UniProtKB/Swiss-Prot annotation:
It comes from Shigella boydii serotype 18 (strain CDC 3083-94 / BS512). Residues 252-266 have a biased composition (Basic residues). This is Translation initiation factor IF-2. Residues 423-427 are annotated as: G2. It is found in: Cytoplasm. The gene is infB.
Length: 890
């Protein structure tokens, strides 16, 4: 091969002349651009380039893994996402010379570390020895100085004590020397311990590095030739091997993985925290550092029960009580069962029960008053100071039709009784009358048995009770009830013996009958005034008013006239044009138009006030009855009326009262349900009469509801589905249609929209104006639901004279009818010696071989008894029939 120049060779290799000259220079050959190159020089350059570019053997592996991930989406649907993981790994085979060089470097590093460890040990030993010597010298100096001070102080003492002091000094010196020696020994032990710890630490580090080197040395000859590591770093190799184990773990979780997994039943298995710590140690933390311990928070069960302060309101659920005591709800339920109370976790229990349960479980109970807001509102009132005399509030009570309203009518000189349906009073009327001797406020209560609660309210709101008794009728049931209400309210009674102008009047009989109930006239040594009156003729009215005023003067009735008013609701109703209307009797203070009132569950601002004559008034003082407008709803009769300052607080108190009433009602219902559980399980099918009741005033609704509910029996129950004040609306009709109920209107009518629903649904709508008729018709409806009573009536007796055998019917009794008539296919009884021995049915009845339907008294016949052949001569066959008797509600 001929020689070529550098330029030609550069053109052939497609490189620059300068680069080629530099490559020749690196190979140890000096050339210029115009020099020629021999074949030997070319080979030298090629060998140099090959040696320079040669590297370790490499092997690159690529892997793809595909999986599907379900991602939850909106609407409960899941979405599948395809995931592909790509991994690439390169394994490098090192040159043996390179491995030797690395081993030499590591050996040198180990020797250097060992030398450093030895030097550190020697240095620490020297430092500890020097420190111990210094401390001993300092201790000796301090002791010598202290000894010199003590010797100088002791020179002035008596000579006979010097010997003792010398001995003590020698003993003290010996003790100090012993302490110094002990201190030196402890210092040497401390230094030795530190040296041992340092040596152990260095040895542990050396052992760990040796294990790493061993792992590196053993990896190449023992592993498969394809399992190469990319780097020589120990930590990188650990991370790489860990990733390999994670990838292969899914496939290799077979027998080995199951065998390595600890069994559940193994009592000696390590705890979860130990397993987590070991797992963390195997993985290694960031940078290859091992975690010392698990970061999970540990919790240990308290060694003893924790007693807590449990705050309990008026009502609380079982679950809330359990949370306050930090126990499970099941434990509270168990504690209640031990106390004899059944409960569920969501049941509302009262304060007393919750207190018993909490104290039984060892906790301290703090009872919380939930009516603090109500008390604050009630206390923030300007009630004035000076009390002035006020008019008496007189309630007229007595039996129905004894002339109460007629008596009051004569006093007021108006015709009130004619306006009452049926001539009986059906709600409380409140009136005040001006007389020559002062003003009197009258409350007229119903006398019918249904209005018990009204009479009770009238007695509670009154100062004096006028008991009206008809002279011709005497004491009646409602008269006795009125006496009981008056005694319960502790108010004096003035007896008005009415209808004294009738010929059959007997006032002495009235006195005798009333004396049996503790009402004694003054002439008999009692405290009650008896006045003979006639509401029709007007006799004795002035004497009655004088007796009332005299009794009021004895009572010394006083009230605060100035300030914020308070009173009671006598009656309430819903007016179609004016909304909720309440008749209020003011007890204290003065009620003004525009005042903010709180009335039971309702509140509002007084928009208008009217007296009993329908006249607008701006204010009402004590003992004055007025109608007020502007409440948020119809209050219950008997509720307290209070004037407050803030309408917002009044609303909060009203809403609180509603919620409290609902909670207490639910708790009471739940308790009764659980207590009557077994009784309800045993009772059979009960018919129900559903009623939707609407009336003109609240008192009538209450009285009618009570009367109807009292009609319920074990077989027929009266259920008031809905009740209210005002006309019958479309909502009431819809409710009645849904519950299959009877619509009852008492002094009210249905509006146009309600009538359409009633016609479309064919509902049973009934109007009443007298409570007698309403109760009687509901009784009739309930009677129709009663199952009839079955009664057995004997219609004939036949005496057996002889017995014949029949191939078709068996034994045939030849009988003589002694009483009544014997009918075919009627039930019979066979009596022997007046004892019933068989009860069955008469199957065959013949007379002279002819089948007949009946045989009358005094005739002979043949009787075949169904499924009975033991008929004997002398037996008596009793024929009877079953009749149904319709029962009625008493």
């Amino acid at each position: 091969m001929t020689d070529v120049t550098i330029k030609t060779l550069a053109a052939e290799r497609q490189t620059s002349v300068e680069r080629l000259v530099q490559q020749f220079a690196d190979a140890g050959i000096r050339k210029s651009a115009d020099d020629s190159v021999s074949a030997k020089e070319k080979q030298t350059l090629i060998d140099h380039l090959n040696q320079k570019n040669s590297g370790p053997d490499k092997l690159t592996l690529q892997r793809k893994t595909r999986s599907t991930l379900n991602i939850p989406g909106t609407g409960g649907k899941s979405k599948s996402v395809q995931i592909e993981v790509r991994k690439k790994r390169t394994f490098v085979k090192r040159d043996p010379q390179e491995a030797e060089r690395l081993a030499a470097e590591e050996q040198a590093q180990r020797e250097a570390e060992e030398q450093a460890r030895r030097e550190a040990e020697e240095s620490a030993k020297r430092e500890a020895q020097q420190k111990a010597e210094r401390e001993a010298a300092e201790q000796a100096k301090r002791e010598a100085a202290e000894q010199a001070k003590r010797e100088a102080a002791e020179k002035d003492k008596v000579s006979n004590q010097q010997d003792d002091m010398t001995k003590n000094a020698q003993a003290e010196k010996a003790r100090r020397e012993q302490e110094a020696a002990e201190l030196k020994r402890k210092a040497e032990e401390e230094a030795r311990r530190k040296l041992e710890e340092e040596a152990r630490r260095v040895a542990e580090e050396a052992r760990r590095m040796a294990e790493e080197n061993k792992w590196t040395d053993n990896a190449e000859p023992t592993e498969d030739s394809s399992d190469y590591h990319v780097t020589t770093s120990q930590h990188a190799r650990q991370a790489e091997d860990e990733s390999d184990r994670e990838v292969e773990g899914g496939r290799g979780r077979g027998r080995n993985a199951k065998a390595a997994r600890p069994k559940k039943g193994n009592k000696h298995a390590e705890s979860k925290a130990d397993r987590e710590e070991a797992r963390a140690a195997v993985r290694g933390g960031k940078g290859g550092k091992r975690k010392g311990s698990s970061l999970q928070q540990g919790f240990q069960k308290p060694a003893q029960a924790v007693n807590r302060d449990v705050v309990i309101g008026e009502t609380i659920t079982v679950g809330e009580l359990a949370n306050k005591m930090a126990v499970k709800g099941s434990q509270v339920i168990k504690a209640m069962m031990k106390l004899g109370a059944m409960a569920t976790i969501n049941q509302v229990i009262d304060q007393e029960t919750a207190q018993l349960v909490a104290e039984e479980m060892g906790h301290k109970v703090i009872l919380r008053r939930e009516n603090e807001l109500e008390e604050a509102v009630m206390s923030d009132r300007d009630t004035g100071a000076a009390a002035e005399p006020r008019a008496p509030v007189v309630t007229i009570m007595g039996h129905v039709d004894h002339g109460k309203t007629s008596l009051l009518d004569y006093i007021r000189s108006t015709k009130v009784a004619s306006g009452e349906a049926g001539g009986i009073t059906q709600h409380i009327g409140a009136y005040h009358v001006e007389t020559e001797n002062g003003m009197i406020t009258f409350l007229d209560t119903p006398g019918h048995a249904a209005f018990t609660s009204m009479r009770a309210r009238g007695a509670q709101a009154t100062d004096i009770v006028v008991l009206v008794v008809a002279a011709d009728d005497g004491v009646m049931p409602q008269t006795i009830e009125a006496i009981q209400h008056a005694k319960a309210a502790q108010v004096p009674v003035v007896v008005a013996v009415n209808k004294i102008d009738k010929p059959e009047a007997d006032p002495d009989r009235v006195k005798n009958e009333l004396s049996q109930y503790g009402i004694l006239p003054e002439e008999w040594g009692g405290e009650s005034q008896f006045v003979h009156v006639s509401a029709k003729a007007g006799t004795g009215i002035d004497e009655l008013l004088d007796a009332i005023l005299l009794q009021a003067e004895v009572l010394e009735l006083k009230a605060v006239r100035k300030g914020m008013a308070s009173g009671a609701v006598i009656e309430s109703f819903l007016d179609k044009g004016r909304g909720p209307v309440a008749t209020v009797l003011v007890r204290e203070g003065t009620l003004h138009k525009g005042d903010i009132v709180l009335c039971g569950f309702e509140y509002g601002r007084v928009r208008a006030m009217r007296n009993e004559l329908g006249q607008e008034v701006l204010e009402a003082g004590p003992s004055i009855p007025v109608e007020i407008l502007g409440l948020s709803g119809v209050p219950a009769a008997g509720d307290e009326v209070t004037v407050v300052r803030d309408e917002k607080k009044a609303r909060e108190v009203a809403l609180y009262r509603q919620g409290k009433f609902r909670e207490v009602k639910l708790a009471r219902q739940q308790k009764s349900k659980l207590e009557n559980m077994f009784a309800n399980m045993t009772e059979g099918e009960v018919h129900e009469v559903n009623i939707v009741l609407k009336a003109d005033v609240q008192g009538s609704v209450e009285a009618i509801s009570d009367s109807l509910l009292k009609l319920s029996t074990d077989e027929v129950k009266v259920k008031i589905i809905g009740s209210g004040v005002g006309g019958i609306t479309e909502t009431d009709a819809t409710l009645a249609a849904a519950s299959n109920a009877i619509l009852v209107g008492f002094n009210v009518r249905a509006d146009a929209s309600a009538r359409k629903v009633i016609e479309a649904e064919s509902l049973d709508l009934r109007y009443y104006s007298v409570i007698y008729n309403l109760i009687d018709e509901v009784k009739a409806a309930m009677s129709g639901m009663l199952s009839p009573e079955l009664k057995q009536q004997i219609i004939g007796l036949a005496e057996v004279r002889d017995v014949f055998k029949s191939p078709k019917f068996g034994a045939i009794a030849g009988c003589m009818v002694t009483e009544g008539v014997v009918k075919r296919h009627n039930p019979i009884r066979v009596l022997r010696d007046n004892v019933v021995i068989y009860e069955g049915e008469l199957e065959s009845l013949r007379r002279f071989k002819d089948d007949v339907n009946e045989v009358r008294n005094g005739m002979e016949c043949g009787i075949g008894v169904k499924n009975y052949n033991d008929v004997r001569t002398g037996d008596v066959i009793e024929v009877f029939e079953i009749i149904e008797i319709q029962r009625t509600i008493a």
